[in-house]
């Protein structure tokens, strides 16, 4: 990988956030054998209950490999980042490179799981952003103080811990999602040396034949999660129930082909579905008004659509930082300096599209089903339709929804 990175520098296709990569690797190396990676692996050895002698032997071998291979690999990354000529690092989007737009089109299809053109997706994003903004304005017009409470983070949930959120969600979704039986899981913090302020939580995809508890890792850094915030509740729903953990459990139970469960990877579907559920789950909150829930849902969708449009703008239409600043200003999200936001999107083309374009596909399928079926529409049956095939391209999901509509008429 490092040789490839150096080759990119030579031929002019290097596109990295060099400083962030270097700083993260330095943090990992600094922890040395106290790394949470090694700690976690040692815990896995303990859980095997191999006896004192074998446990001691394997831990010693693991520590040796960690010191001889793992840490030096991170040191090599740091060394390479220092050697790179920052003047040869591209600071604009892919469209400024030879064949860059064509490459972005391929990345776009891979990330979104849809065969729709970029122009068609832009229309969908613009349409949804407008409808979300209108919904926000409708809420604010009725309750002007609510928006102030929202932007100042004063709208809180009752929760003090993640476990209580998942326990309640597991109970609350029973009428709206098909059963997957009892979910055995645990929630563990991400080690501080590996944690990043940009990652609030993640779900570890379990082995097909695994029997250990499913695992959600949460970021305990102060700038990552506030336990009582609406965003944290949504994050837990996204990673846990009815999001990734639930969706994987459903697929493992109902999609009998192990190859599909292990090899099929359609991030547009999996992240789009989880984004849909994080917003849907807000309806279950006690002590948070319906208007506050509606405001949160539509503000998130509005901002997500703008992020997706900005990604397209930077990498497909050649936006500069000034272009991005003007776009955000025109849409009510002006900031004094867009550099960090621009650099994040520029260094990671299509990284957010799986979430946001994927969500739009599911939301539009639901809207179509609701308009077609009217009072015959049922959330549980719709959810079963979009879960039916496991991770799949959206043309398959669309066919499942069409079948649901026909059967429900």
List PLM regions with ranges.
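N-terminal maturation segment of proteins
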Residues: 1-409
